[in-house]
Amino acid sequence: MHKPLFQKTFITNRRFMAEPLNKPKRPPQIRTGLTDTGVKKAADKSARTRAREFALQALYQHLVGRNDADSIDAFTRDLVGFHKADSAHYDALLHGCIEGASALDAVITPLLDRPMAEISPVEHAVLWMGAYEFRQCLDVPYRVVINECIELAKAFGGTDGHKYVNGVLHKMAPSLRAAEVAADQTK
């Protein structure tokens, strides 16, 4: 007997299609650092991005649970993956946002179209982080701050929370990073 050169393959419309038996297999597709949902894979995240994620979770605990910074800090440092985060940036964000909460709220509140009480805790924490980084982390370009905050809001916030965060931070940037925004607009 001879070996068949083709095998029948079932197609959804109940027809068969001839397919070669020795058809070469395609190599698996190499993904470029994104999951199926478009979120960065954990292996591709920078230490600062990880620090922002842990800081956001810690600030959420502070806003919702009213826990003190030291107990939140101890809890967060025990979480899986924290060793890959930039702990200095995490400390600056967590303690800086909690200690400067009233000053950060004073910067954020005039830019809101609703009372602060109606902002979700995730968006509130992301806005705190954005305002803090605008004021204190001058080595981070303002566009990076906005982008990182948008990504945090997409990953942890409500459906359209990232759009709201984007709008507020774009209004905030010219007042806190005036020279940088002006230089960027002249390009």
Curated annotation (Swiss-Prot):
Protein purpose: Involved in transcription antitermination. Required for transcription of ribosomal RNA (rRNA) genes. Binds specifically to the boxA antiterminator sequence of the ribosomal RNA (rrn) operons.
Molecular functions per Gene Ontology: RNA binding
Family statement: Belongs to the NusB family.
Top-level taxon of origin: Bacteria
Cell division is among the record's keywords: no
Region entry Disordered, spans: 20-41
InterPro entries: NusB-like_sf, NusB_fam, NusB_RsmB_TIM44
Protein name: Transcription antitermination protein NusB
One protein family per Pfam: NusB
Keywords: RNA-binding, Transcription, Transcription antitermination, Transcription regulation
GO BP, sorted A to Z: DNA-templated transcription termination; transcription antitermination
Any GO CC annotation of this UniProt entry: cytosol
